[in-house]
Amino acid sequence: MGLTYQLIPVLVCLLVCTSHLVHGHKCDITLAEIIKTLNILTTRKNSCMELPVADVFAAPKNTTEKETFCRVGIELRRIYRSHTCLNKFLGGLDRNLNSLVSKTCSVNEAKTGTSTLKDLLERLKTIMKEKYSKC
């Protein structure tokens, strides 16, 4: 028994609509998890929060959001691989950022100033909250 010609468009519509809902929901979950982790990190009183990092948000104006998130990931990896503090949170944050960007993250290193880890995380939290409100 074959599908009727009237049923095929309905099934295609259901497939498209449900896949859109699933992908949108993943965006919400990932962003919420990133924001939760950033809230935990930024309220901690830890000497690692004063570590110097590259000011990745001082990149040129034509830098895309993905490139910025890649730069943040690079800085997070540099911190949690060379210091033993906050590894669990910084590693999880790095993984979640990578899931928003892509598997390959090739970014040209730009000459930037320095900032602290706390400042980087605070600015990232602001960006993620804005992104979450639009998701």
Swiss-Prot record:
Function comment: Participates in at least several B-cell activation processes as well as of other cell types. It is a costimulator of DNA-synthesis. It induces the expression of class II MHC molecules on resting B-cells. It enhances both secretion and cell surface expression of IgE and IgG1. It also regulates the expression of the low affinity Fc receptor for IgE (CD23) on both lymphocytes and monocytes. Positively regulates IL31RA expression in macrophages. Stimulates autophagy in dendritic cells by interfering with mTORC1 signaling and through the induction of RUFY4.
Keyword Transferase in annotation: no
Family: Belongs to the IL-4/IL-13 family.
Protein name: Interleukin-4
Disulfide bonds: 27-135, 48-85, 70-105
Example GO BP: regulation of immune response
MF GO annotations: cytokine activity; growth factor activity; interleukin-4 receptor binding
Keywords in alphabetical order: B-cell activation, Cytokine, Disulfide bond, Glycoprotein, Growth factor, Secreted, Signal
Intracellular or extracellular location(s): Secreted
Residues with attached carbohydrate: 62
Residues in the signal sequence: 1-24
Record Pfam families: IL4
GO cellular component: extracellular space
